[in-house]
Amino acid sequence: MHKLTGYTNRWGQKQGATIRFHVSSAAKTPFRLRFVRHICADPNPEGPGYEEIELPSPLPATIPGQEHGAWTGSYAQADALKLPAGALTLRATIWPTTPAKGPQGILSLDLPGWSLALAIGPNGGAMLQATAAGRTIAAEVPAPLMARHWYDLTGTLAADGTLTITQTPHRPLKDAGTATAPGATPCPGAPARALIAALPPAGTNPHASAHYNGKIEAPAILAGQTQVATWDFAQGIQTQTATDTGSQHAHARLVALPARAMTGSTWTGAVHDWKSDPSQYAAIHFHDDDQGDLGWPETFALTIPTNWPSGFYAAHISNDAAEDYIPFFVRPAKPASDVAFLVPTYSYQVYGNFVREGRGAEIAERAKARGALLETPDMNPQFGLSCYNHHSDGSGVSLVSMFRPQLDTRPRQMAHIDPAHPHGSGTQRICVDSYFIHWLHHEGIAHDVITDHDLHEEGLSLLAPYRVVIAAQHPEYHSDRMMQSLEDYLSQGGRLMYLGGNGFYWRAEPSEHAPGALEIRRAESGIRTWATEPGESYHQFGGGYAGLWRRIGRPAHKLVGNGFSCQGLHRGFPYKFTDGINNPRVAFMTEGLTPTPGQAFGETGHQGGGAAGHELDSVNFRYGSPEHILIVAKGIVIHEDYGWVNEDMLTHRHPLPQEDWACADACFFETPAGGAVFSVGSMTWAGSMPIQGTLRTLTTNVLRRFIDPAPFPWPE
């Protein structure tokens, strides 16, 4: 378990502005603090060379440490609900997903010395449980609930203290039943807290306990025939508030990002967009391992000095037992160069805390030898999951918050053992993208660093001042505003260098009501670790259709010329120049080179041992690649590790020859406004960038021409 870690309130910030840090220290003693700028974040001694620059800190060298908890499990909470004295009825419609896991709260009430809960009991049946003065009475239906079926549950505490619980399946199943138990204490009549999808706190968690897995619809509290509270989850689907339609308006706040816009018990299959008929989406799916904003208090705040260059930064925190780097990115106070490097922080966040069982043990020996950070998400489940994981009930993780430590999004870190290169770096995210910073720095090319989150907030105005925008190794996730801004930038003559693979692939949506949260839903098709449930393909945050940009009419091919076509392990192969390299339109690429068609380059690299590998993009005119595009090089990866993307899998055979899809197409095209696009089509291109050779020279030539203000003429 990580003993010293933290997070920031923003991925990046401008010079002169303030960024806030939230740190938990298990030692509860002061920790050391320093700030570093990363030129290269790869700790591999066989790599380009780890390079950090320590900066004079405006903050103390030691900071008082406090320990803060990290809790998982979503629920809804309403406070100060006025309960009448005497009898009460609790009611809900549920779709449980793990009824056999043990007690799980569905709707509970508690006040000092008394509580009442509608729940799933220890034997898997519906249960009503009352506690007063430390004495608990419970009635549980003998028949266990079945997973992924709808039930109506009604629990009544009578004035004489009798508990009655009934479960009624919506389908003709044999698990209907009723149970009773005498001797409970009626409601004393006082303001109470209501919890939906959990029981009152117990043990070490001060917030709630016995978290429920599954959907809940229309939880309600009645006193006889009088409505005390009824929460309608069909209202305010885009918000983090559950609306009480009763007279008290005891609206409940949602905790830890449960999933909304979920099909409810009345869903017919005729509606797929929740906005068309919210009543069919009146359910919330809660999970016992959901996690939102951890809410740690601010530990220290940094007003970024105006003389710190734009770049990759980290707060390095350490004590005698642990250390961590908390990354952040510095923007100039106003644009200061012709080049913007766009950090794919949306993709960082979606992938963050990708739990892969055994990964920590797998890399431990090599990571220790390299002096890399040793903490991994599988070793720290308290910090939640990524959108590549499944919840404990088997459903996909669709919501993630940046307000938690993201342990696999750090500098000086390994991610995996390179399968093809004995000295491969096995890096990802920040460490890989730092190869581009290393290149720009050592080539002496001035650049500003901006983030995806900046782009969503500011749109085209962020990009417009720059002559060139560089998209990094794996810019996979984008919001609608980000895609539109990139399109508008190109339409105005901007130049875009896309130096990775599997980019511009999935739609992602931020929330106006849950700061720091992102949502993705994996609709229809695509390379993915899980798929959305039927009828749940529209985002709850923005209400837009989810899934691949290609399915929404914005394939990457239209934006950058190529698009995701092939995936395999981290095993790289060389590129070979095509006839396109001799076209006069790209003569600028060959300065200092004498390329010939068929000539190989990118034969080595710090990722997979070659420049074409892992996730590859190819040109496809059917999907929108411009007709005048030039393929200047192609990396063909015919290997058993590699297969085509499943959105192209219409039958058991691919419609194209393997060399047309198992390839990375490095391509170039001009835009009507005098701009241009250069795309490399491979995630492992980045690993070859620190190596002096043809690939680096070619990339540098492209950038220098893109910086040149002379417009690109439209080809004849």
Predicted regions and their residues:
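Ligand-binding face of N-terminal immunoglobulin V-set domains in extracellular IgSF glycoproteins
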Residues: T5-P30, R37-A41, P48-Y50, L55-S74, ...
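Extracellular glycan-associated modules
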Residues: Q15-R20, A26, C40-A270
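Aromatic-Pro/Gly-enriched surface loop or interdomain linker
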Residues: K28, H38, M262-G292, A322-L462, ...
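Short, solvent-exposed loop/turn and secondary-structure capping segments
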Residues: R34-F35, N44-G47, P103-G105, L118-A119, ...
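Short secondary-structure boundary/capping segments
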Residues: A92, H170-P172, S247, V355-R359, ...
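Short, surface-exposed beta-strand/loop micro-motifs that present aromatic residues
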Residues: S115-A119, H438, C663-T671
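Helical hinge/lid and interdomain linker segments adjacent to catalytic or ligand-binding clefts
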Residues: D289-D290, A301-T303, N307-P309, P422-E512, ...
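Glycine-rich, aromatic-lined ligand/substrate-binding cores of catalytic
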Residues: A514-F706
